[in-house]
């Protein structure tokens, strides 16, 4: 897979270009060269050290760029790597099937679970089909239908959050976008089954919250969670979207800050360089977290599960 490098990764690009060139020479060389192998080893070591240095000191704006990376794993990628026997369920039984939300029953280590998440799309045609991962009311009502089904059949619910926000179009507003989001918040807070929410890319405002109320809320290391995009915040406060980097720093939208404020429960480590560099390893890290948290929640009866969730929600703002 050819990677799209971000601006702050330019020093890494130069090294990896040299490494790839040497690999090509080595691959097509008729006689092995010890000097070539040694130089390749030194460059790979230098590249690794450079990656560690750059990614150990990322600013909020750089993290926001990583969260939006076009090759970052999406919900369907996690379904492929973590779950088996996925049966997708479609439609809200009222208006339409919103492709920006995918969901259905799958198995996690042999156990039936309900998986729901945003899906952005990669190629142009798929992006349009998925509405760039911005759900309309019918998408959130589909998610609600699946969550209520999961409760009836006593299946844990696992959500994957990755959206710039709920779709703000006129049609969406006419069909009750805010009502759909509000109802999801209300219902999710009272579901009698374990709910684990994972912010895996962008966690944009109510569009993220509508599938983000749970017993555990996790964030991938380079994901973001905020009430508005940095560009939107900059446009409002400074009347200048170019001040998005300053806005990102001020908003506290990165995982460590949100963990400090106790708005999320756990930060899931990503491979060096970001989740887009290794989908499989990222999925393994997410899976390990899900299994551990499900085991914790399984020990609670319905009453204690709901009380724990209630206390979690009531503690917001009191850290």
From Swiss-Prot:
Q: Which PROSITE patterns does the record cross-reference, listed alphabetically?
A: COA_CT_CTER
GO process terms (BP): fatty acid biosynthetic process; malonyl-CoA biosynthetic process
Q: What class of enzyme is it?
A: transferase
Main location class: cytoplasm
Which cystines does this chain contain?
A: none
Q: Where in the cell is it found?
A: Cytoplasm
Alphabetized HAMAP family for the sequence = AcetylCoA_CT_alpha (MF_00823)
Classification via NCBIfam families: accA (TIGR00513), AccA_sub (NF041504), PRK05724.1 (NF004344)
Recorded protein name is Acetyl-coenzyme A carboxylase carboxyl transferase subunit alpha
Source organism per entry reads Vibrio cholerae serotype O1 (strain ATCC 39315 / El Tor Inaba N16961)
